[in-house]
Amino acid sequence: MLLVVFALILLGGWWYYDLQMAEIESLRVPGDAKADLEIAKMRLETVRATLTVAAGIGAASALVLSFRRQQHDEFHSTQQRITELRIQAVEQLSSDNATIRIGGLYNLERLGEQHEELRQLVLDEICSYLRRPFDLVTSPPADPEREVRAFAQEILQRRLKRRIGRRNYWSHNRLDLTDAALGVVDFSDCRLRNVNFTRVRFNGPAKFHGTSFEGPTSFTGVVFEQLVSFFDARFDDQVDFKEAAFSSVADLSRASFSGAAWFTKARFAHEVNCSLAEFREYLGFTGVAVDGYANCSGTVFHSYANFSKSVFAGGADFELARFAGVTIFEEVAFEAHADFETVSFGGWTSFARSTFRSSASFEHSVFKESTVFRESAWNWRASFLMVHFNATVDFEGSAFLDDVSLNGALLRQLLHDQSLPGRYRPVETSKGFRFLWTVKRDGSEPVVPQRRPGDAELQLRPGGPELRSGVESV
């Protein structure tokens, strides 16, 4: 520091002296003795002034350097004090006294509020506390630890709200709650980044209304003991619900999934509501068991959707859904009514080896690419009323044990006769192959829908599929 001050004095003094001497020399008049005397006096004054300026520069430099040293010392002192406070707060979290533990959480929150750069560390400490083993199921209601954990959750929920303003929102890079035991949770309207809820047990209702999940999100192996709602939630990256257990109603209505979503081997013990949800990337719903009613009406699947080997025990409603990519329902068991009415299948679709143990309806739906129902089993009524197959459809090896309705269905391309439900014959028209009758299981007279202008007049003889009248252009 002394060398810096000395260098500043020399440079400043030299610059000032050189500038003044140049101006004095410009006043010299050759042969004028009086002028020479005045110049000599001015040189002397310049020397004195230079020394004064140098001294001033030295004093100012010393003052600045002293101020910076003071700032440096104060910064280190503050950092040391912050470290001490953080250590003290963390130590309080290990106290046997619940009141002291709550005080430690309060002190951590205050540190994060006053020092923005510490907020991630504070969130890490709070998450670490919630990851400590604790059984909310077997612990008595009066256990003071319940109050401590509820306060820790409340800090997270309060500080991560989007609507509290930019200054009050705690920006973060991660939230790791792996194996945590949580009570009643409300992360509604929060913005959560890189959240890890792996194997978390939610022992109370969990609300994520309008929550924004940024970065990869994991709910792998999570257990929701009570109702959980992701209504209008936004997942900006991939999300993983593999082997998740939903013990009560699950609401994912209007949720938006911008990245891949995995629900592999998840278990829904009650109703699941995915109505009006949107899946923009791959959806893996394989090996899933839904014991209650599955409502996926109006849901949009922009990419590959795979429901293979899943079980829908309480009914499945996909009415008005839209599948834009490849859709797989292979080896799926529909134990109750399956509703696929007015559905748009935009890509290759397969229901191969699936079982419909109750009624199934695909009325007014559109299959834009090839469709496979090969080796499927239909135990009750199946309706394809007014369905449009814009490419080939394959029912080969399928078993229909009750009535099958293809009234008004339109098939653009014929794979081969054996690919259709038993006892049906395709009738070629100007627009494609039409089916305007219903075949009864017992071979009785079919029910023919009321003829509309342009429809073909087709009937079946009892006991056989032969035509009784000609075909008009359609």
Name the predicted role of every residue range:
Residues 40, 45, 65-66, 98, ...:
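Short alpha-helical segments used as structural interaction elements across diverse proteins
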Residues 26-40, 71-95:
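Membrane-proximal helical linkers
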Residues 1-58, 260:
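Short hydrophobic membrane-inserting helices
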Residues 18-19, 57-81:
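Transmembrane signal-anchor/signal-peptide helices with a preference for the extracytoplasmic
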Residues 75, 83-92, 96-102, 106-109, ...:
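N-terminal leader/targeting and pre-domain segments
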